[in-house]
Amino acid sequence: MNMKGQETRGFQSEVKQLLHLMIHSLYSNKEIFLRELISNASDAADKLRFRALSNPELFEGDGELRVRLSFDKEKRTLTLSDNGIGMTRDEVIDNLGTIAKSGTKAFLESIGSDQAKDSQLIGQFGVGFYSAFIVADKVTVRTRAAGAPADTGVFWESAGEGDYTIADITKDERGTEITLHLREGEDEYLDDWRLRSVISKYSDHIALPVEIQVKNEEDGTVTWEKINKAQALWTRGKAEISDDEYKAFYKHIAHDFTDPLSWSHNRVEGKQEYTSLLYIPAQAPWDMWNRDHKHGLKLYVQRVFIMDEAEQFMPNYLRFVRGLIDSNDLPLNVSREILQDSRITQNLRSALTKRVLQMLEKLAKDDAEKYQQFWQQFGMALKEGPAEDGSNKETIAKLLRFASTHTDSSAQTVSLEDYVSRMAEGQEKIYYITADSYAAAKSSPHLELFRKKGIEVLLLSDRIDEWMMSYLTEFEGKAFQSVSKADDSLNKLADEENPEQQEAEKALEPFVERVKTLLGERVKDVRLTHRLTDTPAIVTTDADEMSTQMAKLFAAAGQQAPEVKYIFELNPDHGLVKRAAEVTDDTQFAQWVELLLDQALLAERGTLEDPNQFIRRMNQLLTA
């Protein structure tokens, strides 16, 4: 082979690390290398079809796209070739020598020593071409970009260690040819029956014909036999597609090793004509929280592939959904910019969003255990829904799950429908509390009255919860009420109109005024409360005041938040409050009041501005 411009280059450090991890973590599932390479060939064919829409000459007189497999037992090689889009020298360096995915370094650092878990994570990452090194100790690539001269072919070769060789060659046929020099012990991939079996398992559903070389034993002639159905799965009728085929197609488009939790395949005719195939994965992708990474569906127009990760068809809170849409109404030359402003896109987005929410409703109704698995993986994303998608807020609310005082468990298993069904007679509101952790929410003094009255409270401890609740105002006509807010309805619950209590409060009015004078502008108000049973004091905020958790959310985002002004509420029946009320010495009185306020602030915020002063004050009072 005549090679020019030959050079040896080092792999990007992340590639070396991924190759090492992959070879060791994925060996038990090594046959997926064939799925990955055929999937890449299918993508190359899709890209050529799309580009040829505006430049038919790229087909170079050969529009019959396919991928071919052949093997040589003597040389111990397996060769896979396609006549798709091919690559230039720069593209080979970018695609085979580096990983362009954002967040790659952080992803690789997250890989540990758990081999089973690592294999799932690496599978999610999308191993693609590099999977060849699971079974090969050397890989050779010959490629030429469609429409480019024959002498612009590229040779690439590597043993999957620290470097690779690249050179310019002459290649008459467009497309890519990958030759795997198999490791010792990998003879099964030199067997015709074994190759057919793997291809049928993983690649029956793709539209690209997969052909295997057949040699005539008598005269040595070579023919090619198609061994997959080569019909786009979503174009077939649902009745003729097996669950295994749906699962295999999911793994093809999502590059996932695990089966999906659920899927929905629909063909819509009428004002708009389209086919959608949507999947709910079983586990969250490694980059779901990476803001730089695009998430979206594969877009086809009249069965022609247009683009990957078309995010315009799904709201951000459903970014975990995988699948495709095949539209008959969009133009073949559609771009991301056109999609953004298209009424057709908006209508499709609305319809697909409703389809996914219906799928989740059905899953929650039919299989609570599977839905709980979904919630553990994607619940945090779904909690973004009420703020992002007001038109579907009620449906999303039904899908939310919470921890609750009813279950005495940190597991988020309680639905709002569950809560409403258990509401006490006469109860008009859905009570909840937000805190930094489940333990802090569960032990909050704000719950004392509700435990006493046997009223269930939802325990919210995810960072997003306070923000979510600012958009969730009611459910089935029942208003949401934070138990950490100062509210008249909570006073009624506490029977604060009891004549005996009113008499006791009157006697403590001078004490309350004394506390107000001492604290001044540091608090919004000082009040007596009967919401507490075991705690001497709490702080609350007015209904229109920013809550503690919302202020923390602003701070975490680096935004300036207004200072939270608390209402200081004292329990007149508690021994410490009674003791403080009896103190006549101003200095000692100030110590008691400051201690009670610090206790209340610590319970509410989890921190104090000056914890050392709090400790000194407490020690002084303990030894007084």
Curated annotation (Swiss-Prot):
Which keywords are on file for this protein? ATP-binding, Chaperone, Cytoplasm, Nucleotide-binding, Stress response
Q: Please list where the region (B) is annotated.
A: 337-552
Q: Which GO terms describe its molecular function?
A: ATP binding; ATP hydrolysis activity; ATP-dependent protein folding chaperone; unfolded protein binding
Which InterPro entries does this chain map to? HATPase_C_sf, Heat_shock_protein_90_CS, HSP90_C, Hsp90_fam, Hsp90_N, Ribosomal_Su5_D2-typ_SF
Region labeled A — which residues? Answer: 1-336
Q: Which domain of life is it from?
A: Bacteria
User: According to its UniProt record, where is this protein mainly located?
Assistant: cytoplasm
SUPFAM superfamilies with a match to the protein in the record: ATPase domain of HSP90 chaperone/DNA topoisomerase II/histidine kinase, HSP90 C-terminal domain, Ribosomal protein S5 domain 2-like
Quote the SMART domains the UniProt record gives. HATPase_c
This entry carries the following GO cellular component terms, namely:
cytoplasm
C: region residues: 553-624
Protein localization: Cytoplasm
Family of this protein? Belongs to the heat shock protein 90 family.
Q: What does this protein do?
A: Molecular chaperone. Has ATPase activity.
Please name the PANTHER family in this protein's record.
HEAT SHOCK PROTEIN 90 FAMILY MEMBER
Question: Subunit comment for this entry?
Answer: Homodimer.
Matches recorded under NCBIfam families: PRK05218.1 (NF003555)
Q: What is this protein called?
A: Chaperone protein HtpG
Native organism: Yersinia pestis (strain Pestoides F)
**Name of the gene:** htpG
